[in-house]
Amino acid sequence: MDQFIKQDETGDLIETGMNVANHFLSAPIQGTNSLSKATIIPGVAPVLIGNPEQKNIQYPTTSHQGSKSKGRGSGARPIIVSSSEGGTGGTQVPEPLFAQTGQGGIVTTVYQDPTIQPTGSYRSVELAKIGKERMINRFVEKPRTSTPVTEFKRGGPGAAAQGQTIQEEGIDGNGASAGSKERSGSLSGATPYAHLSLPQQDSTPANVGIAPQSAISANEIMDLLRGMDARLQHLEQKVDKVLAQGSMVTQIKNELSTVKTTLATIEGMMATVKIMDPGNPTGVPVDELRRSFSDHVTIVSGPGDVSFSSGEEPTLYLDELARPVPKPRPAKQPKPQPVKDLAGRKVMITKMITDCVANPQMKQVFEQRLAKASTEDALNDIKRDIIRSAI
């Protein structure tokens, strides 16, 4: 079934209903006996009996509605009924079709033109027309001129909760709101992060951006400041340690300069020694230099002083290779080896025979060998045999 009703069908239904209402409203009222007390709308009975009301009648329901009606009293718009009939003006005629509005118990009144005195039949027809127009206006929704303004609350609900707006019916007017107490939804005390909201089709579009991130709370800021203070103190301690090492670095530099000076002095002294003693020529082995310093025959030819050889024997001898050489030098006699004191060694070996040799026969043999030994090698052989026998 189609849920949408066309505007033409709606107009036909309203027209049929208004024709029925005009038929019953056009009939003259015979008296108060034709209406019971339960069927009369409050505020309309004096009009029906010929005593119109002079003031607006209000029926406050609760204290809350009464407070609202004070601030919204300007929302009840009177209706001016024009007529060609003459009479006494200034009479207020209440609207019987819409006597109660449902907001604060306000009775809507109809003000007549001051120069016109309405009659029963004319009043019924005019009120029926006005009721028809109001009923049509109720079925046809007018476009909104502005979006509903919601009260801004710091730390209110999130974006999902903000999207659900409760619209209350009321009169056209502004009133003071007592507000509501709710727990803050944000610990930082700022507006929570909200996504980009799409413009509504039935309202005036406006450029809306993304709300900024939530502000950092005071506790978080203090924690950050304390952390930065601790890091700064730690950094200051490190800087103090670095400055304390500065004196040591200066001392190391001075010692390094002293070492460089000493090294330069040593290099200068070595250069001086090289100048005084150039050393071996490059590429000449030491053996060849030593052979050049050995004795060899020197032949002197021509006139000269021969006194250096006059005292020597002028005889030449031939060596094993038949080479003429002067008198051969006598062979070197080997130096006699100094006689070592063997008495101490013999005492030591005698003690070893007594302690290490258990066999009496072996002891006797070692003692005889020790008595005959006269050299160091013989004593070493005896000592070696004693150690082997003991093992």
Swiss-Prot record:
Q: What is the protein's quaternary organization?
A: Homotetramer. Interacts (via multimerization domain) with polymerase L; this interaction forms the polymerase L-P complex. Interacts (via N-terminus) with N0 (via Ncore); this interaction allows P to chaperon N0 to avoid N polymerization before encapsidation. Interacts (via C-terminus) with N-RNA template; this interaction positions the polymerase on the template for both transcription and replication. Interacts with host RPS6KB1 kinase; this interaction may play a role in the viral replication and transcription.
The gene designation is P/V/I
What the entry says about domains is: The N-terminus consists of a long intrinsically disordered tail. The central part contains the coiled-coil multimerization domain (MD or OD). Forms a four-stranded coiled coil structure. The C-terminus constitutes the alpha-helical X domain (XD) that binds to the nucleocapsid (N-RNA complex) and the L polymerase.
- Which residues does UniProt call coiled coil? 218-245
**Region named Interaction with the nucleoprotein:** 343-391
* Any Pfam family the entry gives: Paramyx_P_V_C
UniProt lists compositionally biased (Polar residues) regions at: 55-65
Q: Which organism is it from?
A: Mumps virus genotype B (strain Miyahara vaccine) (MuV)
Region annotation Disordered: where it falls in the sequence: 55-90, 145-208
Q: Which residues carry this modification: Phosphoserine?
A: 69, 188, 257, 292, 294, 301, 374
Record region (Multimerization): 216-279
Q: Which CDD domains match?
A: MEV_P-protein-C_like
Cited function: Essential cofactor of the RNA polymerase L that plays a central role in the transcription and replication by forming the polymerase complex with RNA polymerase L and recruiting L to the genomic N-RNA template for RNA synthesis. Also plays a central role in the encapsidation of nascent RNA chains by forming the encapsidation complex with the nucleocapsid protein N (N-P complex). Acts as a chaperone for newly synthesized free N protein, so-called N0, allowing encapsidation of nascent RNA chains during replication.
Record's protein name: Phosphoprotein
